[in-house]
Amino acid sequence: WWGPGYGGYGPGYGSGLGDAFSDMFGDGYGDFNFGMSGGG
């Protein structure tokens, strides 16, 4: 599912079946502040 990703350089929370990399590297496919962990 789609969840909020906190910080572009910190941990991303919420990504389930989206992208594990966004979750680990902190919303790498979204914004640098607040985005969607799992895409963008």
Swiss-Prot record:
Q: Which InterPro entries match?
A: SGP
Q: Which Pfam families match?
A: SGP (PF17228)
User: How is the subunit organization of this protein annotated in UniProt?
Assistant: The protein envelope of the sulfur globules is composed of the three different proteins TR0, TR1 and TR2.
Q: Which family does it belong to?
A: To C.vinosum CV1 and CV2.
Q: What does this protein do?
A: Structural protein of the sulfur globules, which are intracellular globules that serve for sulfur storage in purple sulfur bacteria.
Please give the name of this protein. Answer: Sulfur globule protein TR0
